[in-house]
Swiss-Prot record:
InterPro entries from the UniProt entry: Aldolase_TIM, DAHP1/KDSA, KDO8P_synthase
Protein name: 2-dehydro-3-deoxyphosphooctonate aldolase
Coiled coil regions, renumbered to chain: none
Predominant cellular place of this UniProt entry's protein: cytoplasm
UniProt keywords, alphabetically: Cytoplasm, Lipopolysaccharide biosynthesis, Transferase
Biological or metabolic pathway of the protein: Carbohydrate biosynthesis; 3-deoxy-D-manno-octulosonate biosynthesis; 3-deoxy-D-manno-octulosonate from D-ribulose 5-phosphate: step 2/3; Bacterial outer membrane biogenesis; lipopolysaccharide biosynthesis
Compartments in which it is found: Cytoplasm
Reaction equations catalysed: D-arabinose 5-phosphate + phosphoenolpyruvate + H2O = 3-deoxy-alpha-D-manno-2-octulosonate-8-phosphate + phosphate
Annotated organism of origin: Ectopseudomonas mendocina (strain ymp)
Pfam families: DAHP_synth_1 (PF00793)
GO cellular component, one term: cytoplasm
Length: 281
């Protein structure tokens, strides 16, 4: 099965190529934190030879509580992203929540992300697609893998085939998510690159009453399980002080564990992609 290659600058993203990291922090808590985190990601990924894209949100529009921290907003967020790009020379990905934001975000960011909760919102999907930017489509927690085909079609009909799919877990009762490993293979049949958002798959939505809980201790186990499926990339959030992170701290990898964590995943990805395919249909 031929796999589509999506290009972001000089990075080639495909299910049969070495994995790409979309990594960063959950939300732009501050300019200084963004710079600190990106510097460490760049150091580690350059050392390990992993293609890298910095990620963060300028607005967390779907927080549990009205009092939850949301971020600096569109204008200030784009300024921070521009500084990150200029300082470190890396591409940037961020999420778009409303149709009117799409064009402005696409002017600055190399990849724009369709949030899982909003992935069926046709007006948003079409507005993002019409920018012509590469789009990372998060699979909603309530959608089956095969239903992602409809979202791909919406983008294609709007004239955009620069698309990436991203698994982030499925609802499993209340306050819990699970990852169906068979879903990766189903989505790979669409031939677009497939990523695994291990950070948000560790969430326990609403698990702390007014915010999400998480299972950071299991990040390595879940990441290895997902990346053993031969994927285009990994989506990861890390933080220097997860206990005091302003969003999703319980799911975030400790930033000082980034190098050993990614080193093991790089070795696993290289091994899995060295195997010849076996036809079992």
């Amino acid at each position: 099965m031929a796999q589509k290659i999506i290009k972001v600058r000089d990075i080639e993203i495909a299910n049969d190529k070495p994995f790409v990291l979309f990594g960063g922090i959950n939300v732009l808590e501050s300019r200084d934190l963004a710079m600190q985190a990106c510097e460490e990601y760049v150091r580690v990924t350059e050392k390990l030879g992993i293609p890298y894209v910095f990620k963060a949100s300028f607005d967390k529009a779907n927080r549990s509580s009205i009092t939850s921290f949301r971020g600096p907003g569109l204008e200030e967020g784009m300024k921070i992203f521009e500084e990150v790009k200029k300082t470190f020379g890396v591409p940037v990905i961020t999420d778009v929540h409303e149709p009117h934001q799409a064009a402005a975000v696409a002017e600055v960011c190399d990849i724009i992300q369709l949030p899982a909760f909003l992935s069926r919102q046709t007006d948003l999907v079409v507005a993002m697609a019409k920018t012509g930017a590469v789009i990372n489509i998060k699979k909603a927690q309530f959608l089956a893998p095969q239903e992602m085909k409809h979202i791909l079609t919406k983008c294609e009909e709007a004239g955009n085939d620069q698309l990436i799919l991203c698994e982030r877990g499925s609802s499993f009762g209340y306050n819990n998510l699970v990852v169906d490993m068979l879903g990766f293979g189903i989505m790979k049949q669409f031939e677009y690159p497939v990523f695994f958002d291990v950070t948000h798959a560790l969430q326990m939505p609403g698990g702390r009453a007014d915010s999400a809980g998480g299972r950071r201790a299991q990040v390595t186990d879940l990441a290895k399980a997902g990346m053993s499926q031969g994927l285009a990339g990994l989506f990861l959030e890390a933080h220097p002080d997860p206990e005091n992170a302003k969003c999703d701290g319980p799911c975030a990898l400790r930033l000082n564990k980034l190098e050993p964590f990614l080193s093991q995943l790089k070795q696993l990805d290289d091994l899995v992609k060295s195997f010849p395919p076996i036809e079992t249909a």
